[in-house]
A protein has these predicted regions:
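A short, N-terminal "cap"/entry segment at the start of jelly-roll beta-barrel domains
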Residues: 1-69, 155-219, 234, 323-326, ...
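Conserved short histidine dyad/triad with adjacent acidic residue
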Residues: 55-62, 72-89, 221-239, 257-260, ...
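A short hydrophobic beta-strand segment most commonly corresponding to one strand
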Residues: 70, 94-96, 120, 135-154, ...
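His/acidic/aromatic-lined binding-pocket segments of jelly-roll/cupin-type domains
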Residues: 75-76, 86-88, 92-97, 111, ...
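Glycine- and acidic-residue-biased ligand/ion/polar-headgroup-sensing regions
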Residues: 79-80, 91-103, 107, 229, ...
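Short acidic-glycine-tyrosine-enriched beta hairpin
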Residues: 108-124, 258-289
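Catalytic cores of eukaryotic secretory-pathway lumenal/extracellular enzymes that build
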Residues: 113, 125-131, 140
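Asparagine-centered strand-capping/turn motif at beta-strand->loop junctions
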Residues: 130-132, 296-298
Length: 340
């Protein structure tokens, strides 16, 4: 949250062409955001909450210290039998249901959901969330690339009619601008629509990815990972940053920063020693752009995490993953990679 209101998109200014100092400050921010942290309580510059709903942010462009604006991560809580006000925005948003059961109304259509479903609020959607349980709350973790839409000027959002009747013609179908066939794709991804795979990355369940063309998600790639006690994930390197939500278990994230050596061409210099970031259930682990990293389960129970990336990195030429150390196969046949 900024001093003058909600920060939708953060600016970048410098008197120098090299931005090393900005990068140093960004990477100096803690890379684990503790459970219960509220960086934005949705009291300024928001429109969706009612007296039966609550929204709060863990990761956003207005955070101090600043980490990223490629992804925003927040929670939506609905009281028993409650709903929010509903609103419309141009950016997509993906809701992972942590608790409860309920339904959505998106553009007049109803979509039911329950725990462990992934709900996609598509581009240019007027939507509202409802809790069907009269006794228990519903809770969703929301991952969205809102600032990317803001950068592209896609800022038409809110509620109600905003055009001057005298100056504008009759309503026309906005969906004519969408990619053909998008409205036929899944809006709710259920566990039965996915499968667990043993891959180079470890035990993975992909929810959204460029290859999942049956799902109506265009900008956020999400997978779930299960790491056995005493084991670890893959050690790998990619350009996209990541937000990793710890659903259960505890452990630490090893992160090797990567510096650019810019001579005749770009070359990478990887830190000889990693930084170590411990985490517990409900924490959010942040992995900065261009970082080698690995998760280690040093607890006594399985580690379950939900990992999100902004797909834009893949679309602008950074769709490769460099594998430096495969995850242990734990006696299972490894079938390939299931990276989101």
């Amino acid at each position: 949250m900024g001093e003058d209101g909600r920060v939708f998109l953060r600016g970048l200014t410098s008197e120098a062409y090299g931005l090393d100092e900005l990068r140093r400050r960004q990477r100096g921010a803690p890379r684990v955001i503790r459970a219960g942290t509220v960086t934005d309580d949705a009291s300024v510059g928001h429109s969706g909450d009612s007296d039966r709903s609550r929204t709060w942010w863990m990761l956003g462009p207005g955070d101090e210290p600043f980490r990223t604006q490629t992804l925003q991560v927040h929670f939506v809580e609905l009281s028993p039998g409650g709903s929010n006000k509903g609103h419309g925005h141009q950016n997509e948003a993906l809701f992972y249901i942590l608790e409860g059961k309920g339904y959505e109304i998106h553009d007049g259509k109803r979509y039911e959901w329950e725990r462990d479903d992934l709900v996609i609020v598509h581009n240019d959607s007027v939507h509202r969330h409802y809790n069907l349980d009269p006794e228990r709350r519903a809770l969703a973790l929301v991952m969205k690339p809102k600032s990317a839409w803001m950068y592209l000027g896609l800022i038409q959002q809110g509620r109600g009619f905003g055009a001057d009747e005298a100056a504008y013609g009759p309503p026309e179908d906005w969906a004519r601008l969408w990619t053909k066939g998008l409205d036929q794709r899944k809006k709710v991804v259920k566990p039965a629509d996915t499968r667990w795979e043993d891959t180079r990355d470890g035990r993975i369940r992909v929810l959204t990815s460029p290859e999942r063309t049956d799902v109506r998600a265009n900008a956020v790639d999400i997978y779930q990972q299960d790491v056995a006690p005493g084991s670890r994930s893959v050690k790998h390197w990619h350009m996209a940053d990541e937000a990793v939500y710890v659903m259960r278990g505890r452990g630490h994230s090893l992160q090797w920063d990567v510096e650019a050596q810019i001579g005749e061409r770009y070359e990478a210099r990887v830190a000889k020693e990693p930084s170590r970031w411990t985490f517990e259930p409900g924490d959010l682990v942040y992995v900065p752009q261009n970082t080698v990293h690995q998760l280690v389960n040093d607890g006594s129970e399985p580690l379950m995490v939900l990992v999100a990336q902004n797909r834009l990195f893949k679309l602008i030429g950074y769709d490769s993953v460099v594998y430096l150390e495969d995850a242990p196969a734990a006696g299972r046949e490894v079938v390939g990679t299931a990276r989101a």
